[in-house]
């Protein structure tokens, strides 16, 4: 992967196990990284579904792409608090100015009070069958979901309000500097 610079803008492409595009986002602005995550932000960005439908995100989001684990985390800064949408997904790659990963259906929704809900189990079972997920993949995905739940329960990075707000402030600063140029 090429070395990213603060403020670099990339697209995001989410694929399914069969290689077909699932969803794409027009914008992700590089904020920085640490040992565990590469961090991006966006706000009111255009999203295109596999069937061609489009919509825009409603609020700012800080996205954490894990360098070591099979998940990515989207922190949504809503008026009612910070919500997290966590995708169980393959490790990401960056090619042609695009973040790419395979979405494996299972999602974890985390609410501002720290409670959470596992989403899309039925979709996971359906795709596991028709796309022939291997036993190894199935085991990895279930293990990664457990790890993710433990991160939520322990308030590990990035499930920390202070940290996501700092990342958001940095995102706003980067966007303002880009406008000045």
Task: List the model feature ranges, each with a label.
Residues 94, 137-139, 160, 180:
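Juxtamembrane/interface motifs at transmembrane-helix termini
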Residues 22-26, 57-59, 68-72, 101-105:
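Short, surface-exposed coil-to-beta transition loops
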Residues 118, 127-154:
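A contiguous, mid-protein "functional segment" used to position or interact
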Residues 15-17, 33, 45, 68, ...:
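Generic structural motif
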Residues 49-94:
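The feature represents the first ordered module of a protein
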Residues 79-135:
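Conserved, surface-exposed functional patches that form binding/active-site neighborhoods
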Residues 145-181:
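Cysteine/selenocysteine-centered motifs that mediate thiol-based redox chemistry or coordinate metal-sulfur cofactors
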Residues 1-60:
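Charge-rich, low-complexity N-terminal segments
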């Amino acid at each position: 992967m090429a070395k990213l610079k603060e403020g670099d803008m990339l697209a995001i492409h989410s694929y399914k196990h069969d290689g077909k595009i699932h969803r794409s986002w027009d914008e992700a602005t590089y904020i920085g990284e640490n040992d565990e995550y590469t961090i991006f932000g966006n706000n009111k960005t255009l999203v295109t579904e596999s069937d061609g439908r489009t919509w825009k995100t409603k609020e700012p989001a800080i996205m954490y792409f894990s360098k070591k684990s099979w998940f990515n985390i989207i922190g949504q800064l809503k008026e009612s608090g910070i919500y997290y949408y966590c995708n169980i997904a393959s490790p990401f790659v960056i090619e042609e100015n695009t973040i790419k990963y395979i979405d494996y259906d299972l999602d974890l929704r985390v609410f501002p009070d720290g409670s959470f809900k596992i989403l899309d189990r039925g979709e996971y079972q359906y795709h596991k069958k028709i796309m022939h997920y291997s036993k190894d993949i199935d085991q990895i995905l279930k293990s990664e979901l457990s790890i993710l739940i433990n991160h939520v329960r322990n308030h590990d990075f990035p499930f920390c309000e202070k940290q996501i707000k700092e990342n958001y402030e940095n995102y706003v600063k980067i966007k303002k500097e880009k406008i000045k140029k």
